[in-house]
Amino acid sequence: MSETIDKTDTTTFHMEGKCPFGGDRIGGALGNRPTLENWYPHRLRVEVLHQNGLAADPLGPDFDYAAEFAKIDFEALKRDIKQFLTSSVDWWPSDYGNYGPQMIRMAWHSAGTYRIADGRGGAGTGLQRFAPISSWWDNGNTDKSRRLLQPIKHKYGNALSWADLMVLTGNCALEIMGLPTYGFAAGRLDAWEADNATYWGPEVVEMGSVSSFDDMVNRDKRWRGKNGDADYDLENPLAASHQALIYVNPEGPYASGDPLASARDIRITFTRMAMNDEETVALIAGGHAFGKSHGMTPAKEIGPPPEMAPMEAMGLGWHNPKGSGAGKDTMTNGIEGSWTPDPTKWDNAYLENLFRFEWEQTRSPAGALQWTPKDPDAPKTPDAHVAGQMHPLMMMTSDIALKVDPDYRKVCEKFLNDFDAFTQAFSKAWYKLTHRDMGPKHRYLGPEAVIEDGLLWQDPLPERDYALVGEAEIAALKQAIAATGLSVSDLAFTAFSAASTYRDSDKRGGANGGRLALAPQKDWAVNRRAAPVVEALRGVMATFNDGRSDGKKISLADLIVLGGCVAVERAARDAGVETPVPFTPGRVDTTQALTDLEMFEWLKPVVDGFRNYVDDGFGQMTRSVSPEEMFLDKANLLTLTAPEWTVLTGGLRALNANHDGSNRGVLTDRVGVLTTDFFRNLTDVDLVWEKADADGMTFALKDRASGQTKFEATRSDLVFGSNAQLRSIADAYAGSDGQRRFVADFVKAWDKVMMLDRFDVKGHRRYGPMAA
């Protein structure tokens, strides 16, 4: 039976033209403040583990970038880029008729965010396209550089990532101006959303807030001590001297114009970015051989950065109201001028000018502090846009720093007297700068990738010269490992210790290479428990490898991981679940000579919640971060999701993979058995937690009724019960039906960690052509 609806009834239909919302105000929509971060600023942001997931990627999980890139005519691509570099468009004309210097800056600033402390930053995912990096003051007008490249990006489509295009364009720019580049490797996969997790410093800048802007530029929050004092140091894990700068303030600390103070900042900053003194000088002197700095308009007159620009700007920021806003009116960092008489030619004029002349301070049209030669007869540099117009040479305070610092000066003098050495040093330092975060050479794509050279910063691994073991040999090796009498706990601890050094930020660490047996890792306090296990496994390796005639061998690196498989299988079996743990052989053992001690020392954990480790000095550190936040950071570096993080921790506690073998967090009476006891006891409503120390670092789990202490634990344990998101996952395993799911999920997460560094395995992750 049909029903007639009275359309005049306003309880059913809104009147025409009336807002569907009640009332006459709309206060907000999804994502508008205030949000959780405003209400509860100290909450653990577990959701950051899920950023840049497949849901954000329009290309989907089956897109094979390596295969698509291989279809590109690489030489044709480079010709397209080089043809563009020597062109010019009216809306953003090229300096000197050459976009090369501008593109070098774009590529440099894309790569220059890299820092060795946690491996984050760098050019690897093209994050210069997103906030906050896109809108840092030091990245002024890089938005124009990327927009100029848009036609080339569209021509090659998804076969060429933005991350690769930016670096390759920088390489092409160097080549057309005369520098023989060391090489170029593609293989960078674009991010599809902003990085909302990386810690870039304590400063917060709100538009229109003078006090917060002062917080940014005065540096006091990230630096300790005074420049020149013995305790002068930069907060970890930071590398940049200022918020929103790539390296240092070119006018000197606090825009002081002090070259020696600038040199101190340069050394700290470039060291934090994994560069030594020679590489630092090569990069600064090499980069400043090209182009010019722009400072024709006071900064206060420049519009907001891309992230704050009006919608019609379409992602372009820093609107300049002076003249055309571009060309001869361009404003970028406020300093105006060029370092050399021929800014589009690779030569030694930068160093020649720096040392030949005495320099005096002056001001740019924008008011920035800079330096000009005292000698009125010093060479001039041509205007970038007005034919026949000449200008004095320019140096920044950070350039004069290379002359006044004794150690930097020695390097400068070496390069000044040997242009070939300078050329090679800059070429190799540029390659390192732009490839530092790419990881092993197995990820490298393209005909110009440097594969043969054993560059120490690439953490090289020797080529395998033996046949891999098969199923029969693996079974025999498992029996041999079991026969050693090594416990489930010791085997699991050792395997996880080796594999969990991996960090996806710069693709370093992991079990491949067997570096757990080498300095510095073998000497870390957190790894002390692994030493006897490694020695026992060496014996298994020697017995297996010696005297074989079939060419098959096993590496120590593989045996360490296989030992973990033995432990997990046994622990699951004892819990009533029979399950195989995947094992993929092929890891090799590297040598001490191929291990950079200083660079690997940065992988040493201060806090490792997986192994319930907190460095002895952590409590004495000046810090604003908790152990559980450091634990979350570690989970992110291991690419773990919140469920993977949770199930791994629960399983490792059941196995007792604590660094010292203590029972903290081992919430079970069946140690070494892969049970869900950790989750059941953690969430048991009949038990209550109490602080066991004044700092709230350790806790006692007591029976509510009797007050008897049952277990002890740390913040890295309690977080899985105190954080709502993690507790919801813990509940999924604590239930009566959780055991089999727990074992299955633990095995998957375990294998994921063991395989994170296996870029040599074809099809395992997105790899380059060396994968076999």
Curated annotation (Swiss-Prot):
Pfam families linked: peroxidase (PF00141)
Cofactor stoichiometry and binding remark: Binds 1 heme b (iron(II)-protoporphyrin IX) group per dimer.
PTMs per UniProt: Formation of the three residue Trp-Tyr-Met cross-link is important for the catalase, but not the peroxidase activity of the enzyme.
UniProt-listed PROSITE patterns: PEROXIDASE_1 (PS00435), PEROXIDASE_2 (PS00436), PEROXIDASE_4 (PS50873)
Catalysed reaction, written as an equation: H2O2 + AH2 = A + 2 H2O; 2 H2O2 = O2 + 2 H2O
Species this protein is from: Methylobacterium radiotolerans (strain ATCC 27329 / DSM 1819 / JCM 2831 / NBRC 15690 / NCIMB 10815 / 0-1)
Active site: 109 (proton acceptor)
Function: Bifunctional enzyme with both catalase and broad-spectrum peroxidase activity.
Protein name (database record): Catalase-peroxidase
Annotated InterPro entries: Catalase_peroxidase, Haem_peroxidase, Haem_peroxidase_sf, Peroxidases_AS, Peroxidases_heam-ligand_BS
Location of cross-link Tryptophyl-tyrosyl-methioninium (Trp-Tyr) (with M-273): 108-247
Cross-link Tryptophyl-tyrosyl-methioninium (Tyr-Met) (with W-108) per UniProt, renumbered positions: 247-273
Record: residues binding heme b: 288
Subunit text: Homodimer or homotetramer.
Site (Transition state stabilizer) residue list: 105
GO aspect biological process, one term: hydrogen peroxide catabolic process
Lineage, uppermost ranks: Bacteria, Pseudomonadati, Pseudomonadota, Alphaproteobacteria, Hyphomicrobiales
Cofactor: heme b
Enzyme Commission number(s) of this protein: 1.11.1.21
Enzyme class, first EC level, given as a word: oxidoreductase
Molecular function terms from GO: catalase activity; heme binding; metal ion binding
Stored Gene3D superfamilies: 1.10.520.10, Peroxidase, domain 2
Protein family (similarity comment): Belongs to the peroxidase family. Peroxidase/catalase subfamily.
Key words of the record: Heme, Hydrogen peroxide, Iron, Metal-binding, Oxidoreductase, Peroxidase
GO CC annotations on file: cytosol
